[in-house]
Design a protein with these regions (language model features):
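An N-terminal assembly and electron-transfer interface module characteristic of large anaerobic redox
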Residues: 1-210
Length: 210
């Protein structure tokens, strides 16, 4: 496969969320969630530059992640769900950026061992889906574009990996357009964006000024 003329890496904001209230009750969840987040980041393709918002468990941490995403001018945000969490831990991170938010609803275990599953095991390995509806509803209300990728870690899930890579490629295309110069031959006067070619639409959607 031929390599592109320009190797452009998309800037992708990545963070995970969990509910702070769980952690004092079940301190073993902290290393569990940290390990899951680190493992997830390693599955992301090398065609992107990860802007790491970290593991978020409070609205203040969410706001800090949002500051990083805005400063980096990200092309996409990927959110890993670790367990149930309120949407207030998510929305501050994406409130002031106009890019799609991809929610990764990927459960660690394929199925519970019911005889051995206690509360921290359930919350830490089997409850990634707990707040998906709440997150999507809140993003819709905030006017944010979003998508959900659902699957499982145990045993591998090629469909999940393919979907994530598709989103990263789309983000890469967006970044390339933003860094591209397009020549236009023949125009009445520079800056008159309403004639011949719809320059207004090009600029609005692709940040391209011809």
């Amino acid at each position: 496969m031929a390599k592109p003329l320009v190797e452009t890496k998309a800037k992708v904001g990545v963070f995970s969320i969990a509910l702070q209230a769980y952690l004092p009750q079940f301190p073993q969840l902290v290393p569990e969630f940290e390990a899951q987040y680190e493992a997830f980041k390693k599955t992301l393709p090398d065609t992107i530059e990860i802007i790491d918002g970290g593991m978020v468990t409070t609205k203040e941490q969410s706001m800090a992640a949002g500051d990083k995403f805005r400063a980096a001018d990200v092309d996409l945000v990927i959110l890993q769900m670790l367990t149930y969490c309120t949407s207030y831990n998510m929305l501050p991170a994406v409130r002031d950026i106009d890019v799609p938010v991809v929610i990764v609803n990927v459960q660690k275990k394929l199925a519970p061992d019911y005889a051995k599953t206690d509360i921290p095991t359930w919350l830490g390995e089997l409850y990634a889906c707990g707040a998906i509806g709440e997150m999507v509803a809140d993003l819709n209300r905030a006017g944010k574009r979003s998508a959900v990728i659902t699957g499982v870690v145990e045993g591998g899930d090629p469909e999940v990996q393919a979907e994530i890579e598709d989103w990263c490629r789309a983000a890469q295309v967006r970044r390339r357009f933003r860094d591209t110069n397009i020549a236009q031959i023949g125009r009445p006067y520079p800056g008159m964006m309403d004639l011949y070619i719809d320059e207004t639409n090009l600029y609005h959607r692709m940040f391209v000024y011809t």
